[in-house]
């Protein structure tokens, strides 16, 4: 069983140097050994769905060998319980703000089946030919399903070798777009004036931005994102998108997706991108693979999937295609010259409607959202550790800020570009510190090269 990560001082304070003492070792210390932070964001899975049976994690309870996570099923008029699914493809459930409120059910975490409503879209009915393959042995909807090491062996192998985060929460109780806005800016909002950051108000129900771009409303996000601060500090970054990242007009034009705002690629919609002229830093997956091989990755990288390898429920390809995609990305970094100075963080943008038993903490009116899987993969990761700290995408921003920006926060009071965000989440006491997941004094771990299709 993996040991929990303790929130205590991990090393004794160093005594002051004395005359005649050996010289201190040269070279970077602590997080400054990390020159490359890489964030891979997949789609729509809850923690219990992927890691609910992982030993030592805060997962699904079992009684007499059977899952005890049973909730009301209004269609069958009885309680339905979790079940192990060996499927590759899933239906999932609604994953918007209304569904989140229903799922959480005031903290009881009992509304996941009720949120399905009725009909075939989410297989609430479960009797149609289309839905027959998406139900459990007792006719449970697949939002109650969980997978194990057998179905996603590489993800579990990364958890065994590195760090599994069992209190990673989606940043908001919404879907892909607000989650990715939080990923790069710490906020999700709509703005009355794209040139006035103070005109923005919190909004986690946003529609696809490219529908607005089609009518010339660009840019549309006026508040400050992390790339603006990276630019001010001369820190390199890249946001790597895949074909299919943008699925609405005008993205039907070949080659337009990377520079058109979309749910998984919001940066082109930020005013700051035009103020700093950084549009060319939005690249494609081939660019990431080349840079990882040649040792030219930027300091900060985000990698988001296309439709077919996203793990999104309802995709024509399933979770193993997504796992293969992620494994190829990780393998490329591990085989390249930058592995020794890299940290790869893997997460999923929202819960996809799947059951999770942990009530999300309330931090502000925008979240947190439901729990999602999280992993750290790095030669300096505390091997075989489960991190029980409370985390969200804000912890990614905090680590970027601490490593590359001297601790400068996305704080409108201090970052030189005021906006109207209600909270600066990186400063909240509840938020854990990703730096505690590393052991920089231990011998760095060698690469763990995995078969993408085991």
How would you name each of these model-derived features?
Residues 17-454:
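N-terminal pro-sequences and low-complexity stem/linker regions of secreted or lumenal proteins
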Residues 2-11:
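Bacterial N-terminal signal peptides
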């Amino acid at each position: 069983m993996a040991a929990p990560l303790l929130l205590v001082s991990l090393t004794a304070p160093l005594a002051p140097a004395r005359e005649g003492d050996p010289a201190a070792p040269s070279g970077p210390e602590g997080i400054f050994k990390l020159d490359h932070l890489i964030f891979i964001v997949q789609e729509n899975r809850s923690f219990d769905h992927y890691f609910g049976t992982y030993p030592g994690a805060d997962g699904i309870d079992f009684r007499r060998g059977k899952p005890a996570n049973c909730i009301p099923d209004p269609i069958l008029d009885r309680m339905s319980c979790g079940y192990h699914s060996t499927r590759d493809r899933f239906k999932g459930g609604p994953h918007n703000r209304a569904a989140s409120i229903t799922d959480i059910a005031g903290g009881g975490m009992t509304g996941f089946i009720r949120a399905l409503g009725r009909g075939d879209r989410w297989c609430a009915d479960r009797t149609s030919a289309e839905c027959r393959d998406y139900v459990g042995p007792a006719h449970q909807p697949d939002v109650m399903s969980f997978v194990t090491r057998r179905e996603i062996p590489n993800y579990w192998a990364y958890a065994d070798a590195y760090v599994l985060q069992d209190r990673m929460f989606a940043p908001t109780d919404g879907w892909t777009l607000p989650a990715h806005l939080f990923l790069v800016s710490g906020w999700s909002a709509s703005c009355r004036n794209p040139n006035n950051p103070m005109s923005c108000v919190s909004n986690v129900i946003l529609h696809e931005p490219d529908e607005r771009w089609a009518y010339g409303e660009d840019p549309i996000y006026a508040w400050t994102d992390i790339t603006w601060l990276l630019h001010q500090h001369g820190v390199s970054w890249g946001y790597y998108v895949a074909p299919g990242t943008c699925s609405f007009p005008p993205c039907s034009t070949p080659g337009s997706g990377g520079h058109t705002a979309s749910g998984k690629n919001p940066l082109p919609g930020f005013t700051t991108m035009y103020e700093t002229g950084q549009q060319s830093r939005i690249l494609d997956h081939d660019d990431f693979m080349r840079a990882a091989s040649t040792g030219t990755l930027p300091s900060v990288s985000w990698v988001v999937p296309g439709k077919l390898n996203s793990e999104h429920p309802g995709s024509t390809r399933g979770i193993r295609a997504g796992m293969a995609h992620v494994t190829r990305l990780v393998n490329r970094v591990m085989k390249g010259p930058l592995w020794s100075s890299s940290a790869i963080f893997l997460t999923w943008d929202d819960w996809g409607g799947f059951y999770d038993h942990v009530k999300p903490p309330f931090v502000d009116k925008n979240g947190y959202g439901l729990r999602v899987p999280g992993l750290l993969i790095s030669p300096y990761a505390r091997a075989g550790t489960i991190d029980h700290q409370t985390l969200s995408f804000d912890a990614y921003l905090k680590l970027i800020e601490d490593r590359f920006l001297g601790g400068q926060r996305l704080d409108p009071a201090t970052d030189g570009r005021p906006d109207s965000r209600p909270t600066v989440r990186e400063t909240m006491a509840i938020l854990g510190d990703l730096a505690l997941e590393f052991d920089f004094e231990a011998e760095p771990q060698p690469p763990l090269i995995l078969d993408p299709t085991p």
